[in-house]
Amino acid sequence: NPNGSPLDPHQQQQQQQSQDMPHFGLPGPQPPSSQQQQQQMQVHHQQQQQQQQQQQHQQQMQMSLLPGPYRPHIEEKKLTRDAMEKYMRERNDMVIVILHAK
């Protein structure tokens, strides 16, 4: 059959395409969703970091502002958290940096 040999590579190509298409189609929708999750996690992590930094900063300020008897660590932490929440409420110019993972 003279048509047999030219048809073979063409059929192979079609088979490759049908195998490749699901392979190419799957990663398309997936990365954006995992990217968004990454982004949200990063934002959440950064907000936590910011709060921790503020807590540390305020702890240092309290330590220098409050001479006198040494306060128990737990009480001090509670005070700092209250101060931090008050600070977060009063400050409206908070800047949150969002990193976009590529």
Curated annotation (Swiss-Prot):
Annotated GO biological processes are: crystal cell differentiation; imaginal disc-derived leg morphogenesis; imaginal disc-derived wing vein morphogenesis; long-term memory; negative regulation of Notch signaling pathway; Notch signaling pathway; positive regulation of G1/S transition of mitotic cell cycle; sensory organ precursor cell fate determination
Q: What is its main location?
A: nucleus
**Name the UniProt record assigns to this protein:** Protein suppressor of hairless
- From the Swiss-Prot or TrEMBL record, state where the protein is found: Nucleus; Cytoplasm
Annotated stretches, region: Disordered: 1-72
**Which UniProt keywords are listed?**
Activator, Cytoplasm, Developmental protein, DNA-binding, Notch signaling pathway, Nucleus, Repressor, Transcription, Transcription regulation
Which family, according to UniProt?
Belongs to the Su(H) family.
- Spell out the subunit comment: Interacts with activated Notch. Interacts with Hairless, this interaction preventing its DNA-binding activity. Interacts with insv (via BEN domain).
Gene Ontology cellular-component terms listed? CSL-Notch-Mastermind transcription factor complex; cytoplasm; nucleus; polytene chromosome; RNA polymerase II transcription repressor complex
The record describes the protein's role as:
Transcriptional regulator that plays a central role in Notch signaling, a signaling pathway involved in cell-cell communication that regulates a broad spectrum of cell-fate determinations. Binds directly the 5'-GTGRGAR-3' DNA consensus sequence, which is present in the regulatory region of several genes. Required for neurogenesis in imaginal disks. Acts as a transcriptional repressor when it is not associated with Notch proteins. When associated with some Notch protein, it acts as a transcriptional activator that activates transcription of Notch target genes.
UniProt GO MF annotations: DNA binding; DNA-binding transcription activator activity, RNA polymerase II-specific; DNA-binding transcription repressor activity, RNA polymerase II-specific; histone acetyltransferase binding; RNA polymerase II cis-regulatory region sequence-specific DNA binding; RNA polymerase II-specific DNA-binding transcription factor binding
Per UniProt, the ranges with Low complexity bias are 33-64
